[in-house]
Amino acid sequence: HGAAVLMCEQPRASCSTAGVVYLPLEECLEQADVILTIGGDGTILHEANLSLRYAKPILGINLGRCGFLATCEVSEMEAKLSAVARGEFSVDNRMLLYVRVLGHDGWEGHALNDVVVTKGRLQQAIDFSIYCDDILVEHYRGDGVIVATPTGSTAYSLAAGGPILDSQTKGVV
């Protein structure tokens, strides 16, 4: 189809395919039109920040056990890649959480699935203040908190008794 295949240099030793251009990861992501992941949902979750940083859609080829996000099966890969090369695809935009955890082990970033903050090995409960758009939502004391996007509502949040949200819902659990 005339599309160039770019691959980051890291897996080069395990993949030697004619016609593939190997580049440093940053350069590969800058030049690519689509990020192709081969694995399962965990692989997509791992690459979601790259997708966000470079404003590139992800096409997930499912090799894992769970394919909620990696919806393309290996048997469909050739047809899907041909469709992408022809520009015949749609992008399913998903909600992301921007998270800032303050305190001793502070963290800042984006989450496609969920954010889980727990007391860890501490024997006592911890205090939480949860803000949304810089507005205090709740302050409480407990073992931890899970905040999940609609995408993440089928993961840890569901296992903890939370509801399943439609992927296009504009809200969090």
Predicted regions: what is each one?
Residues 35-37, 115, 145-149:
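Short hydrophobic core segments
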Residues 1-34, 75-90, 101-109:
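ATP/NTP phosphate-donor binding region
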Residues 41-43, 66, 151-153:
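Short glycine-rich anion-binding loops that position phosphate/pyrophosphate groups of nucleotides
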Residues 66-143:
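Catalytic core of DAGKc-family lipid kinases
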Residues 17, 46-49, 70, 127, ...:
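Short glycine-/acidic-enriched loop or helix-start segments at secondary-structure transitions
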Residues 37-41, 48-50:
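N-terminal glycine-rich "phosphate-gripper" loop used for MgATP/nucleotide binding
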Residues 50-61:
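Gly/Ser-rich helix-loop-strand patches that form or flank binding pockets
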Residues 135, 139-173:
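Gly/Ser/Thr-rich active-site loops/lids in small-molecule metabolic enzymes
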